[in-house]
């Protein structure tokens, strides 16, 4: 099996397919094919450290051969789910893709200390959410989630802004980092984390039909009465902007 030492950089080469010379090659580095016109992952290398696919009309991740990858960036693609994704990824980024609507696929775990970024997609359910390792950042901002059922009880940073959630039931109880929840439709604090070791960023809103909840000082007081927050609280007056 052939081996290449170093990164393979093929971004913005106007490629329509992955060159067949790379089929089954082991790359001791990253593999970058961003911003081409590649539609399938035929001829994909056998293994590499990091995968950069963004900006291609790729409709499926089928073709990736390795079971583990440290970093996978899949922004601005045409995939609708995670079919073909490696079984374990440390950092996965899926952004700016309104066709993406499901976690169905082969992904089983986000590694310890890693991150899951799924942002600006049509994801509406956490069915098939992979196992989340220790101290993982989860960013699910600006999707179409209406429920957090299926989330782990503990994570590192948690960002859930821009979703039509009316409560946080099913969400993490313990956040070891920061928590962001702007532009929400929350009606109450049901499911709100019990412990947040970092900072909190939220939009204020008229929860409980109480106009005082639009007053920052009152909102923060209510928040801290329900949750042990180690850091500071940053509140925005822009709410229910979805």
Show which residues each predicted segment covers:
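N-terminal capping/linker segments that flank leucine-rich repeat
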Residues: 1-26, 31, 213-242
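Concave beta-strand-loop units of leucine-rich repeat
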Residues: 10-14, 27-38, 45-58, 68-79, ...
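A structural signal for leucine-rich repeat
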Residues: 21-23, 43-46, 62-67, 83-87, ...
